[in-house]
């Protein structure tokens, strides 16, 4: 009986879910040739399962590379912004744009 437990577990994990799904469709649709229908269903389910495994096992460096490039460009953008704020030429622009920094010019206008 010890051999039946691993066999039962294998069937319950690998075969039963797909077979039950096919049997439900078979009972619902009642095709003219049920065995041919069920056989084709199982073949199709196996093909779909193989495609899913291939998709999951594919390496994804093409998708990760743009993300890495985008992450690398973020500090460069931050450095550019920081450089523009620390540039002495931009300081007068921020001072003149503030109404409280030069009240005499605002009242004359």
Swiss-Prot record:
Give the matching InterPro entries: Dpy-30_motif, DPY30_SDC1_DD
| Species this protein is from | Schizosaccharomyces pombe (strain 972 / ATCC 24843) (Fission yeast)
Record field: compositional bias (Low complexity): 88-101
Q: How does it assemble?
A: Component of the COMPASS (Set1C) complex composed of ash2, sdc1, set1, shg1, spp1, swd1, swd2 and swd3. Component of the Lid2 complex composed of ash2, jmj3, lid2, sdc1 and snt2.
Q: What is this protein called?
A: Set1 complex component sdc1
Q: Does the keyword Nucleus apply?
A: yes
Q: Where is this region: Disordered?
A: 49-109
The UniProt entry's GO biological process terms, in alphabetical order, are: transcription initiation-coupled chromatin remodeling
Alphabetized, the UniProt keywords read: Nucleus
Alphabetical list of Gene3D superfamilies matching this protein: cAMP-dependent protein kinase regulatory subunit, dimerization-anchoring domain
**For bias kind Polar residues, which ranges apply?**
73-87
Q: Name one GO cellular component term.
A: cytosol
Q: Quote the function comment for this protein.
A: The COMPASS (Set1C) complex specifically mono-, di- and trimethylates histone H3 to form H3K4me1/2/3, which subsequently activates gene expression by regulating transcription elongation and plays a role in telomere length maintenance.
Family of this protein: Belongs to the dpy-30 family.
Under Pfam families, the record lists:
Dpy-30
Origin, by domain of life? Eukaryota
Q: Principal localization?
A: nucleus
Q: Where does it localize?
A: Nucleus
